[in-house]
């Protein structure tokens, strides 16, 4: 019998200047499965980078990844950026309980 653990990821709105991002309040996933965290940023300017941070319980924010116009990968996650840059998706490839956190999508130059 395989034990399936559910992971809840909380998301938060990020606002810097006039740029506003919107995300769902929370998402759930089974352990060891990919999690796709969407972020809409329709007011993005041409010089704004898309930054993702996460905050684990009882800790400060931690950098995850950032990008400008193309898709980006690192050891922690991938960032898929839409061609018009008005939305992006943070992808956690194999979520574990250690990934349960508040995730922030923020725009800044």
UniProtKB/Swiss-Prot annotation:
Predominant location: membrane
Keyword Membrane recorded: yes
Keywords of this entry: Adaptive immunity, Cell membrane, Disulfide bond, Glycoprotein, Immunity, Immunoglobulin domain, Membrane, Receptor, Signal, T cell receptor
GO biological-process terms attached to the record: adaptive immune response; response to bacterium
Residues spanning the signal sequence: 1-19
Name of a matching Pfam family: V-set
UniProt-listed PANTHER family: T CELL RECEPTOR ALPHA VARIABLE 26-2, T-CELL RECEPTOR ALPHA CHAIN V REGION-RELATED
Protein name: T cell receptor alpha variable 26-2
Gene name, Swiss-Prot/TrEMBL: TRAV26-2
């Amino acid at each position: 019998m395989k034990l399936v653990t559910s992971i809840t990821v909380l998301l938060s709105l990020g606002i810097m200047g006039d740029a506003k991002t919107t995300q769902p309040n929370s998402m759930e996933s089974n352990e060891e499965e990919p999690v796709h965290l969407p972020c809409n940023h329709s007011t993005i300017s041409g010089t704004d980078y898309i930054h993702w941070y996460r905050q684990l319980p009882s800790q400060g924010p931690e950098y995850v990844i950032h990008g400008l116009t193309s898709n980006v990968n690192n050891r922690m996650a991938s960032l898929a950026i839409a061609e018009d840059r008005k939305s992006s998706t943070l992808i956690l490839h194999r979520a574990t309980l250690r990934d349960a956190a508040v995730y922030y999508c923020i725009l800044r130059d």
